[in-house]
Amino acid sequence: MVKSVADRFFLGLDFGSTRIGVARNCGSLAVPVGVLPRASCAEILGYISRYSIDEVVIGLPLTLAGKEKQSARLAKEFSRFLVSSGVQVRFFDERFTTVIATQKFYSLGKGVKQIRKCVDAAAATVMLQLFLDMEVKVDPLERKP
């Protein structure tokens, strides 16, 4: 039996220049998990095990024209590591997720130093929420007659 989106567990990863933002879902809601240094393969595998993750959603950095940024290469390299570890991986366009997360923090009156500490996890949360929202729209198990 195929699980609906709300019954599956996803881990969202947003690759920043030095850190990886991590988010997971609780049903159809994305929640932040934290921020890791970019070379944290073992920790991410630990999250996958701890949260019984069915699939990892990796944010793919794209330009406004839809072309891959240089950092997309790093995301793809990391995806190959996950796949070789038996993890199911999917890419998702992460354009503007950091901008959206940063604007939310500014609207809450947060300063630059506060934002810098958690913006990667917030961007991963925004990206994963967008992914979940799109999946629910196309998931036939989620549709009501």
Swiss-Prot record:
Organism the protein comes from: Tropheryma whipplei (strain Twist) (Whipple's bacillus)
Subcellular location: Cytoplasm
Assigned protein family: Belongs to the YqgF nuclease family.
Cited InterPro entries: RNaseH-like_sf, YqgF, YqgF/RNaseH-like_dom, YqgF/RNaseH-like_dom_sf
HAMAP family: Nuclease_YqgF
Biological role: Could be a nuclease involved in processing of the 5'-end of pre-16S rRNA.
Chain segments annotated as transmembrane: none
CC annotations in GO: cytosol
One GO BP: rRNA 5'-end processing
Protein's UniProt name: Putative pre-16S rRNA nuclease
UniProt EC number: 3.1.-.-
Keywords: Cytoplasm, Hydrolase, Nuclease, Ribosome biogenesis
